[in-house]
Amino acid sequence: HKAMAEIGVPPHQTAVISGIGCSSRLPHYMNTYGMNTIHGRAAAIATGCKVTNPELAVWQVSGDGDGLAIGGNHFIHANRRNINLNMILLNNRIYGLTKGQYSPTSPRGFVSKSSPYGTVEDPFQPAELCFGARGHFFARAVATDAAGTIEILKAAYNHKGASVCEILQNCVIFNNGTHDSVAKKEDRAKNAIYLE
């Protein structure tokens, strides 16, 4: 909300499109156009929204499971097409809404309900996926750093073309502490590198 207020685009010129998952209730809390779509299809629907109405500021919100598993193909092509679309990827490294299955960003060896002996796959790195699809803008922040998150969202909006903002979040129920190395202010100072 704060980033959008600082950007200054009126609500009637903004759309927030989401998929399914913990991230995806956001359109219901916004005083903008919005749609909570089906699993994995948020980037495709947001693309259609932007192409149909190019003057609309379109924000697409997905989680790591929604956006990179069933929606991975749409994520790739939204980056490749490079239309002026702002994609927010809320990454908690787990399927939290469906009660704790591993996601495309869960680390190798991660034990969950769907991987009782640990995952055998290496995780997707959203930045690599973005740039591999010829994306031009990628930024990452941690949800506990409100000022940093606001700054990357504003930078994404000001970028002309597709932008991806990965926001690292905690899931206190099924994956608590997953981003502790950067979530706490004192640790972030030691472990984070800020680039512009």
Where are these regions (language model features)?
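Thiamine diphosphate
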Residues: 1-59
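Generic secondary-structure signature for well-ordered alpha-helical cores
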Residues: 2-9, 51-54, 80-84, 90-93, ...
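Glycine-rich beta-alpha junction loops
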Residues: 20-22, 92-94, 145, 168-173
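Short, hinge-like loop/turn segments at secondary-structure boundaries
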Residues: 33-34, 78, 103-107, 156, ...
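A generic, well-ordered mixed alpha/beta core segment in the N-terminal half of proteins
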Residues: 37, 43-47, 51-117
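Conserved thiamine diphosphate
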Residues: 55, 103-156
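Short catalytic-loop micro-motif centered on adjacent basic/acidic residues
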Residues: 60-62, 137-142, 164
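Flexible, low-complexity linker and terminal segments
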Residues: 171-196
